[in-house]
Structures are given as C-alpha cells and as structure tokens.
Amino acid sequence: EYNWKNSDEISIYYSIVAKEADIIMGSREEFDLTEKLIKEGMTDEESASLWQGYNAKIVVIKHGMKGSTAYTCDGQKFSIKPFPVEARKGFGGGDGYGSGFLYGLYQGWEVIDCLEFGSAEASMMVRSNNCSDSLPGPDAVHAFIKEEKEKFGEMIARV
C-alpha cells in the first residue's frame, strides 16, 4: 500500500483517474484494486465494459505469464502470450510492456501489433539483469521478435 492509508484510498484515487483515461493498462490485480469499491470480482470483459462506459478507448488487462488482452471501444478483443524467455528477475517487465505498447500505438499500429511489441519488450526486460538501463530501443525489439518467430513460428505470442 506504499504511502496510502489503506486499499480503499487507493481504489478511490485509481478509479477517479481511470474514469478520465483514454487508455487503461494494468494487471488483473491492479484492476481488482481499482474496482474494489465499485464492484468486486469482475471479469476482464466486465472491467473493460465498465471503463469504456466512462472514457476509455482501449483497456489492456495483463495476466503475467498467462498473457494479456486488449479490449477496444468498438468491441474488438486481442490477446497475446508472453515470449518464452528465462526470467532473471520479476521486475521491469511491466514498464517494458507499457512503453512498448504505447510506442506502437503512437506509431499508428494495429492493437495486436502493439500488444506483441509490448510483450516482446517485457520479455526482453525480465531476461536482463537490471531495469531501466536494459530498456531496449525499437530496433532491438523488432530484431528480438524476428528472431523468436524464426525459432518458434509466426504465432509464437499471438493467441
């Protein structure tokens, strides 16, 4: 809970921000915390519908090693799995995922390609020994995706 008084306070402030956001991205646990005082135990689809009822155009819900799904305001759903790497640490992946996804979005890519790029960057981050110093640039991420697809096939991360 860091510097928050309690989880209810976190839920209040997270939900205030989420109601105004165009893009909401977080782990299932973060969504559960945000929605705690609204309705507990929502499914991913219910969460996406809730936030898109306010302002969100894209809702991305991450499930760690199980992958992630993006829900768009036009009713589309895109899912991705993580690239198979040997994780050296349990931190840094979320930052890599978020920056990779947003990079693709601002490049005008399709949502599934943004998910793939974010997933690749997250996988690259958790297999490294440190955090922000290891954040790969776009060329390195593209090379990683190409290399992984050559080894495992085109659909390696796509569901």
Give, region by region, the residue ranges found by the protein language model.
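Conserved beta-alpha-beta core of the PfkB/ribokinase-like small-molecule kinase fold
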Residues: 1-46, 66-67
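Conserved phosphate-binding/catalytic region of the ribokinase-like
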Residues: 10, 36-159
